[in-house]
């Protein structure tokens, strides 16, 4: 996908490049399906048909019914829509339980709900970054209306067993809503929706453009669901506003494309991840932050010497692009690493490398070579 062989893009957890075939679908849709899907005349009817086809394609990758799939503008909107809408369906309590390593688009809506009188309990992860399921379940009782947990952490790649969590939550309180942020999981790990009520995904993490996402909303909730904003009757009245048909078609194309290669990509990603881990063993200062059960697409480590922004700038001079934390937390220390109990030096020197199917061993080797030079050169300057 990259046109420049000298450029090594290793920040795919932040965003991915739009696949050429996806861009082609969007370009064609903009020219051929320009009519409003809600219009009653011929071009509008054809747009509606294309929208329904795209919805069905995305729904198939999640294993849900088409009518349970709602298009949004991004994963953050999906999270907000799910959380703020779902709590309005429950009046029997005020309890909310959430993991301590959630994305800001989950954290901040829940902080706002806490100001409104909801009892929000934040459960820290274990020191290795994995979900402390037992502690989360300890807080689920008859007054718990919502439990939220991401499926794959965006900073360290932790894979959480949300299917088991959802089953255990429902066993304790069948009326508790379970929300899952699957933005980093979709098209990387299998998703089973059993016992999950709402689930969010995003296009720009799977080689679709920014500006398109989706929300799975179970039929169990839809009748009582009250969205936080109002308008037209698009998306069954739950997400008002004229649908972005070209991007919805692009999302469907991207998801369909990646669904065919999940197993082969997983094998390739594991090889790249292992190559990077082996290469980092040459640096005694380096501490791996990603746990063993992390998805292979993400490897987070601390080099415990040079501040992240300095090392990132050094790497960027050679057109090697990685990150220090979540792009959505720009300029802020990693709350995930802090929740894991990492010390300030480890947090300040953390680097996240994240792969996609277009990356190669040469990308890893280029990173390691430049990183080695940086460790030598930048430490001399610091001294």
What are the roles of these predicted feature ranges?
Residues 1-383:
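Pyridoxal 5′-phosphate
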């Amino acid at each position: 996908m990259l046109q420049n062989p000298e450029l090594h893009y290793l920040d795919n957890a932040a965003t991915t490049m739009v696949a050429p075939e996806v861009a082609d679908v969007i370009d064609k849709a903009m020219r051929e399906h320009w009519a409003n899907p809600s219009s009653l005349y011929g071009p509008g009817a054809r747009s509606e048909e294309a929208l329904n086809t795209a919805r069905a394609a995305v729904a198939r990758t999640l294993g849900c019914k088409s009518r349970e799939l709602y298009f949004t503008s991004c994963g953050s909107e999906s999270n907000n829509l799910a959380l703020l809408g779902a709590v309005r369906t429950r009046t029997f309590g005020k309890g909310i339980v959430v993991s301590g390593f959630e994305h800001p688009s989950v954290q901040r809506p829940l902080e706002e709900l806490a100001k409104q009188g909801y009892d929000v309990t934040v459960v820290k992860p274990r020191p290795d970054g994995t979900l402390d399921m037992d502690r989360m379940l300890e807080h689920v009782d008859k007054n718990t209306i919502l439990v939220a947990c991401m499926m794959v952490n965006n900073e360290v790649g932790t894979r959480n067993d949300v299917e088991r969590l959802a089953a255990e939550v429902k066993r304790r309180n069948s009326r508790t809503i379970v929300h899952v942020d699957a933005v980093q999981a979709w098209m990387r790990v299998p998703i089973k929706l059993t016992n999950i009520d709402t689930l969010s995904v995003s296009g720009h993490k799977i080689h679709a453009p920014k500006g398109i996402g989706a929300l799975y909303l179970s039929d169990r909730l839809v009748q009582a669901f009250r969205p936080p904003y109002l308008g037209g009757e698009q998306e069954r009245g739950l997400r008002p506003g004229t649908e972005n048909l070209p991007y919805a078609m692009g999302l469907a194309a991207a998801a369909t494309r990646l669904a065919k290669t999940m197993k082969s990509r997983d094998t390739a990603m594991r090889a790249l991840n292992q190559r990077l881990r082996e290469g980092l063993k040459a640096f005694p200062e380096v501490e791996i932050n990603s746990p063993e059960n992390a998805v292979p697409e993400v490897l987070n480590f601390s080099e415990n010497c040079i501040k992240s922004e300095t090392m990132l700038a050094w790497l960027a001079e050679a057109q090697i692009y990685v990150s220090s934390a979540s792009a959505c937390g720009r300029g802020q220390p990693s709350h995930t690493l802090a929740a894991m109990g990492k010390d300030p030096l480890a947090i300040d020197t953390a680097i996240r490398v994240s792969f996609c199917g277009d990356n190669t061993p040469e990308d890893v080797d280029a990173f390691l070579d430049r990183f080695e030079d940086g460790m030598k050169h930048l430490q001399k300057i610091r001294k």
